[in-house]
Amino acid sequence: MRAIGLMSGTSMDGIDAALIETDGETVAWLGSALTIPYGAETRALLEGAMADARGVNARTDRPGRLVEAERRITTLHGAAVRALLDSLRLTPADIDVVGFHGQTVLHRPDAALTVQIGLGQALADDLRIPVVADLRAADVAAGGQGAPLVPVFHQALVRGLDLPQPVAVLNIGGVANVTVLEDGADPIACDTGPGNALLDDFMAARTGRPYDDDGASAARGQVDEAAVAEVLGHPFFAAPPPKSLDRNEFRAFVTERLHLAGASTDDGAATLTALSAASIAAVVPLLPKAPKSWIVAGGGARNSTLRAMLAERLGVPVVVAEQVGWSADALEAHAFGFLAVRSLKGLALTFPTTTGAPEPLTGGVLFQPTP
């Protein structure tokens, strides 16, 4: 089947749209992708919506700016699909399904609550293409973490690679997550801790720029290793997989312990980057076997300082997704196209070893265009 996957991650920097050909079990090819960046107004709206979501107690609650944000991102996701189709000279009739993640505004698996805004029916009607959305809800309702969702996709991709195993596929978005894969074993997965979110927010506040471009600021700074070690004392980092995080889970905890207010921009960036690397490395002792190969995707893959810190702490080769024929920027969008096809076929999206679900579970809600 030919699917388009859509992803707007916790970094809130834009929408990734990617074409994929798959039967939901194997990947025939990873097609073209594009990114539609969010403007400053949309990003501010999403940040406000995320703040308003803190008081949400049910998945359908839409207080404050959530209603406007949901409409806005649905419209923008439709525009992203059309832009991708136009770039490939395709029409909606050429696409079997769209996988629509939406925007996570609240993730509290401890309260059996995860909220992704986005109007699946409106998107299906706009595009005239079937849409699968709400991909996390069934897992959380069954007692799972609802994240990460992508391990089954990583498993399909890694089957075609000749790398020393176990292989870790690391996505560094706003939150970082890892999938650990070995032939004959169920995938193991979890969120590892802060990815880019805290660093991006720090850079935006200090410089007005949305991120530390290629880790240039961090490369000039000095890491406060004692402060990083103090943050790693949080119980989350000692908990075994599966486990997951909300984007803002550590904001107050980290800010207080890293003493960022008194740090220079470069030193703050260096320490936050080191925290991301150290929290990823901290998952290794919690695994049955240490990964022998690491493949890095997501926005963090574009940060050479973070990659260097990660390689130093892991002590094994770290390669970016492009080095194995994938796209670091589009990997999660490709994943949601893959997951949409699995959902259509009733195949499992989540597993006890990836989200803590009680059994392998399918998920997602299908929205057909209104006749």
UniProtKB/Swiss-Prot annotation:
Keywords in alphabetical order: ATP-binding, Carbohydrate metabolism, Kinase, Nucleotide-binding, Transferase
Superkingdom per UniProt: Bacteria
UniProt cross-references to InterPro entries, sorted A to Z: Anhydro_N_Ac-Mur_kinase, ATPase_NBD
Single GO biological process annotation from the record: 1,6-anhydro-N-acetyl-beta-muramic acid catabolic process
Catalytic activity: 1,6-anhydro-N-acetyl-beta-muramate + ATP + H2O = N-acetyl-D-muramate 6-phosphate + ADP + H(+)
Record field: transmembrane: none
Entry keyword annotation includes Phosphoprotein: no
Record SUPFAM superfamilies: Actin-like ATPase domain (SSF53067)
Gene Ontology MF, one: kinase activity
Enzyme Commission number: 2.7.1.170
Functional pathway: Amino-sugar metabolism; 1,6-anhydro-N-acetylmuramate degradation; Cell wall biogenesis; peptidoglycan recycling
Positions annotated to bind ATP: 9-16
Matches recorded under NCBIfam families: PRK09585.1-5
PANTHER family: ANHYDRO-N-ACETYLMURAMIC ACID KINASE (PTHR30605:SF0)
Family note: Belongs to the anhydro-N-acetylmuramic acid kinase family.
UniProt function note: Catalyzes the specific phosphorylation of 1,6-anhydro-N-acetylmuramic acid (anhMurNAc) with the simultaneous cleavage of the 1,6-anhydro ring, generating MurNAc-6-P. Is required for the utilization of anhMurNAc either imported from the medium or derived from its own cell wall murein, and thus plays a role in cell wall recycling.
UniProt name for this protein: Anhydro-N-acetylmuramic acid kinase
Lineage: Bacteria, Pseudomonadati, Pseudomonadota, Alphaproteobacteria, Hyphomicrobiales
